[in-house]
Amino acid sequence: MPKRGGGSSQRYNNNVGNGGGRYNAPEDFDDFDVEDRQRRKDRNKRRVSFKPSQCLHNKKDIKLRPEDLRRWDEDDDMSDMTTAVKDRPTSRRRGSPIPRGKFGKLMPNSFGWYQVTLQNAQIYEKETLLSALLAAMSPHVFIPQYWRVERNCVIFFTDDYEAAERIQHLGKNGHLPDGYRLMPRVRSGIPLVAIDDAFKEKMKVTMAKRYNIQTKALDLSRFHADPDLKQVFCPLFRQNVMGAAIDIMCDNIPDLEALNLNDNSISSMEAFKGVEKRLPNLKILYLGDNKIPSLAHLVVLRNLSILELVLKNNPCRSRYKDSQQFISEVRRKFPKLVKLDGETLEPQITFDLSEQGRLLETKASYLCDVAGAEVVRQFLDQYFRIFDSGNRQALLDAYHEKAMLSISMPSASQAGRLNSFWKFNRNLRRLLNGEENRTRNLKYGRLACVSTLDEWPKTQHDRRTFTVDLTIYNTSMMVFTVTGLFKELNDETNNPASMELYDVRHFARTYVVVPQNNGFCIRNETIFITNATHEQVREFKRSQHQPAPGAMPSTSSAVTSPQAGAAAGLQGRLNALGVATGPVAILSGDPLAATAPVNSGSAAISTTAVAPGAQDESTKMQMIEAMSAQSQMNVIWSRKCLEETNWDFNHAAFVFEKLFKENKIPPEAFMK
């Protein structure tokens, strides 16, 4: 049927309308036919073209930071690590060659784990599916791990690359007895990891089984494959899992000397930051058969005195063709290294230089005069017991009539806004305009100082975290600085649950104590407050279940009644200064007796007037409370300690200190 517009074909007619047009002879198009055939011939040829990048618009974008790469490598669902080609490509550029096979090659990943998915197989039993897979792969076998059934599929994992590749190429060959074809899909992936208390407890039990107490060595090689962890996936190559393992080591075996981490697919050592403080005795470290890409990852271990190191079968080892160069680079990071990859190293050539004097050993506290240690300890005990009580007005007798108090804290951008203390802030970098602003928050006078402290929220200081520097101690004055942590408690004091809601703060308080009449009092005090660091908070929470043996009285201490201890307290100790012949007081006896019925200093319970074992029941209860307060043991274990020593308080304190140093007191003794 002829087409509209004239003629049976428009090949020789340029008319594009409905009517006739100019006629062109066929011989005029001979050259056109030749060119048209050539174009069709060229179009049938396969060609390869490249798309321009959609996201890299600038050469600077090509360079990726190492931390970005590490974050992508540790992605939870491993979506960016999938290297297998999709089973059914949804699109292909015209002219690109068609893949010959149905499945792409499964590329090995750095973690060595692969996820197998069986779509719509959730209605079948595990034995049925596994038998069909093994029959299709015969004579090859594999062991599926972490099998789980999802809503519309079955998922399991394998750490055998060859087995994963064979499963991927099964295609339609694997089928069930009813004819259903499995069609497994394989991609890179790792099992899910949920770190909770139950998970950590299983890790702890398994690690205890692998610890050698004689050699202080812990073997965590191929830890995820331990039979005790069969039901959970515990990959040490994940930073959070390795961090949990290091926490367990730090809490239970801080004296660890040898650690074996062979064959765990570890590619990053970020979890080992600060390990020199947490495991200071670590000297032997095995990291063989892992995925450590370069020696730069071992910088976090540079502060450890590593004597033996294993790095065989790691990418960082293969980067050096010259073994001597590799040894030299490792020794630059670990100068004390003696053995590397099982081979003893030759001694390094060093110059015989005269050894320089070493720095003095750091200590928690500094005392310019040891005679002032007991005085300061008594002062802190009484002062902070009143400070943490409900009535801080009792501190009036502790301050001089012309005492001065200054409170400061860092800027909000550095430490966060400390709302409860911010109005007292006298940070001079913040108050630059005018003398009035700089002196407005300087408290002058006894009443102003105590009133300011009374406006603080309720606090609870932790004596275990205290450090003391006594810089001046003579007959004219004593100057000392106290640092530590305290809890800022919730203002709802009537609600018992509010006692558990608190923020941890760090403080530094400097006192200038001078003689006044027949006693001593605080002449000047400066206070610095800031938020506690994450490490300080972690150590603070850990110390809540540990005793404070430093608060225990010495066996040679005189022991008096609670009332006498409250009245005397610091006064008797201050007589050693030789300033006053009569009683000397920083704090008066009455407010202390009213706020602290049991003295936690060296004077606690009388044993001079009453023979051991002959106390009445009320005295025994006071002794139990004093023992519990000083040792941090609960009431039951405090009573047991006193009963076994025939209610001799000094002997009970001596026995407690001895057993505590030997780690023979069970943890339940400190659970209240």
Curated annotation (Swiss-Prot):
Repeat positions for LRR: 255-280, 281-304, 305-332, 333-360
Residue ranges constituting the NTF2 domain according to the UniProt record: 375-529
Keywords, ordered alphabetically: Cytoplasm, Leucine-rich repeat, mRNA transport, Nucleus, Phosphoprotein, Repeat, RNA-binding, Transport
Entry's Gene Ontology BP terms: mRNA export from nucleus; nuclear export; poly(A)+ mRNA export from nucleus; positive regulation of RNA export from nucleus
InterPro entries the UniProt entry points to: Leu-rich_rpt, LRR_dom_sf, NTF2-like_dom_sf, NTF2_dom, Nuclear_transport_factor_2_euk, Nucleotide-bd_a/b_plait_sf, NXF_fam, RBD_domain_sf
Domain spans labelled TAP-C: 618-672
Ranges where the record places region Disordered: 1-52, 73-101, 541-564
Note from the entry: Mutations affect the morphogenesis of embryonic neurons, embryonic muscle and adult sensory bristles. This is thought to be due to reduced rate of protein synthesis as the mRNA is not efficiently being exported out of the nucleus.
Family, per entry: Belongs to the NXF family.
Protein name: Nuclear RNA export factor 1
Organism listed in the record: Drosophila melanogaster (Fruit fly)
Organism taxonomic ancestry: Eukaryota, Metazoa, Ecdysozoa, Arthropoda, Hexapoda
